Each structure stands twice: as C-alpha cells, then as structure tokens.
From Swiss-Prot:
One of its GO terms (biological process) is translation. The gene is rpsS. One of its GO terms (cellular component) is small ribosomal subunit. InterPro entries: Ribosomal_uS19 (IPR002222), Ribosomal_uS19_bac-type (IPR005732), Ribosomal_uS19_SF (IPR023575). Keywords: Ribonucleoprotein, Ribosomal protein, RNA-binding, rRNA-binding. Protein S19 forms a complex with S13 that binds strongly to the 16S ribosomal RNA. This is Small ribosomal subunit protein uS19. GO terms for molecular function: rRNA binding; structural constituent of ribosome. Belongs to the universal ribosomal protein uS19 family. The keyword Membrane does not apply.
Length: 95
C-alpha cells in the first residue's frame, strides 16, 4: 500500500535543501546522500546524486523518467557474482 496522498512524497529535508540551493545558484554538483528512501521529485531532474549502497556511493543522473521512483532503486545493494561454472562441477563424484 502506498503513502497517503495527504502526506505527500518523502524527501529528506537536508537533501531537498541542497537541491534547492543548487537550483538557485544554477550549479550542477554531485550530492552525496544516504537517504535511499527519498522520492525523486521534479526539482532533482538534471542533477547527479551519489546514493549510498552500503559499500560506496553510486552516482545516479536524474532524468524525467525517474520522477516518482525512490533513489535506492537505482543503487543496487547486492552483487551477482555469477553462477558456478559447469566444468568445475563435472569432475566431482557424488557420494
């Protein structure tokens, strides 16, 4: 179930403040954030936000299509190392 429309989308207040300051100044800097739950709002379009994935900050360039999604959706927290190679399991004998 989604968030109440009465409350509006969640955006970290500090992140929104930084975005508004950059928009007023007309600058495009990379902004580091740990707030993966923040919703992407139209004010963020055109900015690059470095979203923390638990290991490092992943730079995410915000486009029009991303509005309404959360920042954490674009910074994956799990790495897929790949499946085991078939040749490695062929030589083993089951007991």
């Amino acid at each position: 179930m989604g968030r109440s429309t009465k409350k509006g989308p969640f955006v970290d207040p500090k992140l929104l403040k930084k975005i508004k300051q950059l928009n007023e100044a007309g600058e495009k800097k990379i902004i580091k954030t740990w707030s993966r739950a923040s919703m992407i709002v139209p004010e963020m379009v055109g900015h690059t936000i470095a979203v923390y994935n638990g290991l490092k900050h992943i730079p995410v360039y915000i486009t029009e299509n991303m509005v309404g999604h959360r920042l954490g959706e674009f910074s994956f927290t799990r790495r897929f190392g790949g499946h085991a190679d078939k040749s490695a399991s062929k030589g083993q004998v089951k007991k």
